């Protein structure tokens, strides 16, 4: 596992723990602003993990694909990056 994936995994586990806390807060009918703050913290963790995976992918899989002689493989990687980027900016 790459260092980026290891760091992303830590972020995902932290987000998972935070989501459990948020669910408990909602079930306990806690103050809305407190819940929203925790929600934003979870979103931040997920965005950071996404960025780590994206950077790792560009520096490994994407880079390798661009170094091949296969135009189809190159185009497939470009299309995948465009798809993920569009999803991330929605």
Regions found by a protein language model. Name each.
Residues 1-90:
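Solvent-exposed interaction patches of small proteins and small membrane subunits
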């Amino acid at each position: 596992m790459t260092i980026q994936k290891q760091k992303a995994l830590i972020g995902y586990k932290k987000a998972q723990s935070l989501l459990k806390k948020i669910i408990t807060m909602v079930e306990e009918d806690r103050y809305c602003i407190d819940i929203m703050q925790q929600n934003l913290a979870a979103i931040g963790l997920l965005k950071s993990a996404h960025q780590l995976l994206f950077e790792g992918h560009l520096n490994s899989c994407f880079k390798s694909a661009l170094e091949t002689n296969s135009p189809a493989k190159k185009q497939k990687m470009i299309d995948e990056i465009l798809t993920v980027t569009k999803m991330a900016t929605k």
